[in-house]
Amino acid sequence: MPQYRSKTSTHGRNMAGARALWRATGVKDDDFGKPIIAIANSFTQFVPGHVHLKDMGQLVAGAVEAAGGIAKEFNTIAIDDGIAMGHSGMLYSLPSRDLIADSIEYMVNAHCADAIVCISNCDKITPGMLMAALRLNIPVIFVSGGPMEAGKTKLSDQIIKLDLVDAMVMGPDKNVSDEDLAKVERSACPTCGSCSGMFTANSMNCLTEALGLSLPGNGSMLATHADREQLFLEAGERIVDITKRHYEQDDYSVLPRAIACREAFENAMALDIAMGGSTNTILHLLACAQEAELDYTVADMDEMSRRIPQLCKVAPSTPLYHMEDVHRAGGVMAILGELDRAGLLNSDIPTILSPTMKEQLAKYDIMQTDDPKIIDFYRAGPAGIRTVKPFSQSCRWDTVDNDRAAGCVRSLEHAFSTEGGLAVLFGNMAVDGAVVKTAGVDNDNLTFTGPAKIYESQDTAVAAILGGKVVEGDVVVIRYEGPQGGPGMQEMLYPTSYLKSMGLGKKCALVTDGRFSGGTSGLSIGHASPEAAAGGVIGLIEDGDIIDINIPTRTMDLKVSDEILAERRIAMDIHGWKPVSRERHVSTALKVYALMATSADKGAIRDISKLK
């Protein structure tokens, strides 16, 4: 029988001083012996997805204490990728994932907490918290802040739906008037919550449902909707239940590594592919698998991408649907239900809520249940009122979207495509793999051959695109932007957005050892591994070299002979695999990150072999 971890600091004469300090935080005599639940919040006023989380920790704390636990809240950092985008601030985004994981480990282990409730939402916060949870392997539940409502505005006498990416694309587009741009800017992000499309934040929050570590609706219920409050309250109540089951009933099945097992990671990847999630999710799932000590690789993901169909299509891959529409169609449980009926889901594994995923789907998949409470839950919709307050509205759709032939979520027979929304490419340009969000690639661009235009920073690529130096047929290559080379593996949302602004969105390809925002669409291939700074072939490409991309065959090749590449490699070995000329201040903190970072095919995690 495992002992409560908290007894280390709450029991015995030698801990009189520690108990005195616990008392100073509000712990009373009859509290000692109760499980201590750490509430890892991520409130900040910098990030729309987190601006409303200030009181969420105490909401959960109240539920924890009512259920018989001691709740202690702390906060992690949270970076807004959209605000940090397009300048040196983006160097810090991915490294913050590791800092978040470490900060949770530090707080939870230093204070001997027994379990964790992770209150996350945006891009690096959810994966950082997942890494910590799987590293610590103590009872955990995830509850996120929820998605933003989609924006709406009137352009050319039409009401259109909007999101952040629309504002980014229209900004440099000279065909968009100042008046229309102002309308879009003011309408694109109308409420608190994670940006409204299937971008990285929402993708990751959906994946926590597939991993079995969050409650149904966590990934899709709007931040503004009153129904979301119940997710926080239930998380607080349930964490006490599973914590007592582990420590008092010797139940190891409730631990995160038991729930988020290899089969659960396969479910998460199946969901990711089926819903056309962000390519960043591949990076984060690889990192989380490492923390869980699972042998799960890009090769496994590649195999799945060939047999999992795309059953859901959401912005930025289509303007028709946003997260509020995914929720109306039944959310993550609906997509998992369709995968299960197609024989593509491991449904006999546990979740934090049910003994098996199959039992959970029987209750929460709108195509299986006739429970009016569940149907009502998935009718929760947007109010269309600008606000930063959570739970501020209770609007509902008249009906759920259960149209599996032409709705937001499709059945296998009516899939958007027979292959999924993400793919891994291999070839001499990416020996260890590169990733592309096929959900956002036009069918005419599934194969593409063109000359390389080489840029050794995002900044120079942006200047070239906006300056008219990139033309139809080019393959824009942005290198030395990987985990080591950046350092920090910047997102390339602005280059892809500006290609669209210049009318080149379907006429060019972009390849990088950096990564892409979940808001990216088009023929944008990232995570090329090994990265240039690690000696990858992407560092050997020269202007005018022909690059051949073939998504159906999952290949990406540089049409240069092995002999010429060998000669170039000798020259680069002498040069030191660094940009020929690039002015960039790299802080000491980022240099430390770069020293330990692996390439994207390993999840950009730390190379712990360097510690031996």
Curated annotation (Swiss-Prot):
Any GO molecular function: 2 iron, 2 sulfur cluster binding
GO process terms (BP): isoleucine biosynthetic process; L-valine biosynthetic process
Cofactor(s) for this UniProt protein: [2Fe-2S] cluster; Mg(2+)
EC class (word): lyase
InterPro entries linked: Dihydro-acid_dehy_C (IPR042096), DihydroxyA_deHydtase (IPR004404), DiOHA_6PGluconate_deHydtase_CS (IPR020558), ILV_EDD_C (IPR056740), ILV_EDD_N (IPR000581), IlvD/EDD_N (IPR037237)
Entry EC number(s): 4.2.1.9
Keywords noted in UniProt: 2Fe-2S, Amino-acid biosynthesis, Branched-chain amino acid biosynthesis, Iron, Iron-sulfur, Lyase, Magnesium, Metal-binding
Keyword DNA damage: no
Binding residues annotated for [2Fe-2S] cluster, in chain numbering: 122, 195
Positions where N6-carboxylysine occurs in the chain: 124
Active-site feature positions: 517
Catalytic activity: (2R)-2,3-dihydroxy-3-methylbutanoate = 3-methyl-2-oxobutanoate + H2O; (2R,3R)-2,3-dihydroxy-3-methylpentanoate = (S)-3-methyl-2-oxopentanoate + H2O
Cofactor descriptive note: Binds 1 [2Fe-2S] cluster per subunit. This cluster acts as a Lewis acid cofactor.
Binding site for Mg(2+): 81, 123-124, 491
Pfam name, any one: ILVD_EDD_N
GO annotations of cellular component type: cytosol
Quaternary structure and partners: Homodimer.
PANTHER family found in the cross-reference section: D-XYLONATE DEHYDRATASE, D-XYLONATE DEHYDRATASE YAGF-RELATED
Function: Functions in the biosynthesis of branched-chain amino acids. Catalyzes the dehydration of (2R,3R)-2,3-dihydroxy-3-methylpentanoate (2,3-dihydroxy-3-methylvalerate) into 2-oxo-3-methylpentanoate (2-oxo-3-methylvalerate) and of (2R)-2,3-dihydroxy-3-methylbutanoate (2,3-dihydroxyisovalerate) into 2-oxo-3-methylbutanoate (2-oxoisovalerate), the penultimate precursor to L-isoleucine and L-valine, respectively.
Stated name of the protein: Dihydroxy-acid dehydratase
Organism: Psychromonas ingrahamii (strain DSM 17664 / CCUG 51855 / 37)
Gene symbol of the encoding locus: ilvD
